[in-house]
Amino acid sequence: MTVDEAETGAGPDSEPAAAGAGWRPGAGDADARVLVVDNYDSFAYNLVQYVGEVAGAVTVRRNDAVDLAGIRALDPDGVVVSPGPGTPAEAGVSTAVFALDRPVFGVCLGHQALCASRGSRVGHAPEVVHGKPSTITHDSEGVFAGLPDRLRVGRYHSLSVEREALPDELVETARTDEEREVVMGVRHREKPHLGVQFHPESILTPRGKRMVRNFVEVCEEHE
């Protein structure tokens, strides 16, 4: 979750995602078709742009403009759940999408939705962060494959997942390298479901596009 809608402006290139758009060809060499669930966040467009640069095709739906049956009808190879204001309970289809067996990548609010879908608690973060660069450590798997052990990322959130309440089916994959550690990433032990609390599409996350590419590769491998 971002602190509020205004805080998520990603710079001059940001614009609202086109919620009703059909499949648009991507510029990448991958065949995967990726749906982006837009949680009414200005960062969603940046995610769509990143996905479009590496995937075979991309489309966008607002979180209240499609249900699980509609997503299945679209038949994407993977789904990205965007950041946004509010809580997972207020984010439409964003939590239900994790009932799918196909790859799903949750970003910020999407990450919290993944955790909430498995019974995790989402509460107030140790501090409210708005465009804060942080260093994280990670497990070098999933979206972190092939990346340095320590990464700089951009954080925009007032809520976070409570580590003590993570169920056994979720593995913590990243955390802040600070005195008050915050869960920065999780993955499901069996399903190809991944989440990150930070914003890979932010200018404050230099390796963010590689993370999106890694997710598209997960989609390719799952086909």
Predicted segment positions?
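Cysteine-nucleophile active-site neighborhood
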Residues: 76-145
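Proline-centered loop/turn at the N-terminus of a beta-strand
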Residues: 103-105, 121, 152, 171, ...
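Histidine-centered divalent metal-coordination motifs
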Residues: 108, 157, 199
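Short gly/ser/thr-rich secondary-structure transition/capping motifs
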Residues: 59-65, 86-88, 134-137, 153-156, ...
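Catalytic beta-strand/loop cores that center a nucleophilic Ser/Cys/Thr
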Residues: 140-190
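A glycine-centered loop/beta-turn motif at secondary-structure junctions
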Residues: 177-223
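Generic structural signal for residues in well-ordered beta-strands
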Residues: 57-60, 122, 172
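N-terminal beta1-alpha1 cap of cysteine-dependent amidohydrolase-like domains
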Residues: 1-95, 206, 210-223
